[in-house]
From Swiss-Prot:
Annotated segments matching region Disordered: 136-158
GO biological process: translational termination
Function text: Responsible for the release of ribosomes from messenger RNA at the termination of protein biosynthesis. May increase the efficiency of translation by recycling ribosomes from one round of translation to another.
UniProt cross-references to SUPFAM superfamilies, sorted A to Z: Ribosome recycling factor, RRF
Annotated compartments: Cytoplasm
GO cellular component: cytoplasm
Keyword field: Cytoplasm, Protein biosynthesis
Keyword set includes NAD: no
Protein name listed in UniProt: Ribosome-recycling factor
Gene assigned in the entry: frr
Length: 182
């Protein structure tokens, strides 16, 4: 595995963790909070963002405007039954979701969830590292690399892994500050 492949795979892991962070509620309304909501539409689970446009008219409200007005009630039901704890307000054309301020207890829960997502990201990074080191060891065993070259490449893989883990930890710290900010 070349260094650019290694970095690309690790970058994907960090980006996936970042997307998970974006689904965690902070005190502000954000359309990405609804990213994981699927709507039962014509017998198929369809992502909400493919059925409606999502916007934030102000810092405490998310507006959901369906492309097909026939899906309005289905979207409202999907939001109401999600585990996000939102109560959708349907005015016949647009669904408005008021995002209430977070309690201190809820903020701590979201910090724990962010830490869990960060740990999952680190596990993914370590998996990429393990695959890269296994390939290096295989090349050494086959005689394509000397023992010194193998050790140097393994050290380089470890340094790259450490850099990406530090980046993940920075993203986690930033998210925790964002969550805890009142």
């Amino acid at each position: 595995m070349s260094n650019s492949d290694l970095e690309a795979n690790m970058r994907k892991s960090v980006e996936a963790t970042q997307r998970n962070f974006n689904t965690i509620r902070t005190g502000r309304a954000n359309p990405s909070l609804l990213d994981r909501i699927n709507v039962e539409y014509y017998g198929a689970d369809t992502p909400l963002k493919s059925l409606a446009s999502l916007s934030t008219p102000d810092s405490q409200t998310i507006a959901v405007q369906p492309f097909d007005m026939g899906s309005l009630a289905l979207i409202e039901k999907a939001i109401a039954t999600s585990d996000l704890g939102f109560t959708p307000n349907n005015d016949g054309k647009i669904i408005r979701i008021n995002v209430p301020p977070l309690t201190e207890e809820r903020r701590k829960e979201f910090c724990k969830l962010a830490a869990k997502y960060s740990e999952e990201g680190k596990v993914a990074l370590r998996s990429v590292r393990r695959d890269a080191i296994d390939k290096i060891k295989k090349q050494e065993k086959e005689g394509d690399l000397s023992e010194d070259q193998s050790r140097d490449e393994q050290d380089q893989v470890q340094k790259t892994t450490d850099r990406f883990i530090a980046e993940l930890e920075k993203h986690l710290a930033d998210k925790e500050v964002e969550i805890l900010k009142v």
